[in-house]
Amino acid sequence: MPSVIFGLLALAIGLLGLTAWWWSVTEFLRGAVPVALIIFGLVALAAGVQSVRVPPAGKRANSDPNIDG
């Protein structure tokens, strides 16, 4: 029960602060969103590059001899 009360109190104070300092919040978001997009883009690029990489020479993609094909 105390966690519910604390959560509601924190939510109320957060909403009050959001409305009181709205322009500061938008200023922060204007700076944080491009940085977050760059970071997420780099992570997506790294994941894509890893999935496209060619296996080293001498190793086949399907090394199971029981696969017909």
Curated annotation (Swiss-Prot):
Induction of expression: Part of the probable 17 gene mamAB operon.
Keywords attached to this entry: Biomineralization, Iron, Magnetosome, Membrane, Metal-binding, Transmembrane, Transmembrane helix
Gene Ontology MF: a single term: metal ion binding
Localization of this protein: Magnetosome membrane
Coiled coil: none
Gene disruption phenotype: No magnetic response, fewer, smaller magnetosomes which do not contain magnetite. MamC localizes at mid cell in a short chain. Magnetosome vesicles are approximately wild-type in size, shape and chain-like alignment, but there are many fewer vesicles, only a few have crystals. Deletion of approximately 80 kb of DNA, including this operon, leads to cells that are non-magnetic, lack internal membrane systems, grow poorly, have reduced mobility and take-up and accumulate iron poorly.
Residue ranges annotated as Lumenal topological domain: 24-31
Annotated membrane topology: Multi-pass membrane protein
Residues annotated as transmembrane: 3-23, 32-52
One term under GO cellular component: magnetosome membrane
Note: This bacteria makes up to 60 cubo-octahedral magnetosomes of about 45 nm in diameter which contain membrane-bound crystals of magnetite (Fe(3)O(4)). Expression of just the minimal mamAB gene cluster (MGMSRv2__2365 to MGMSRv2__2381), including this gene, is sufficient to form a minimal magnetosome chain with small magnetite particles.
Family listed: Belongs to the magnetosome MamI protein family.
Protein name: Magnetosome protein MamI
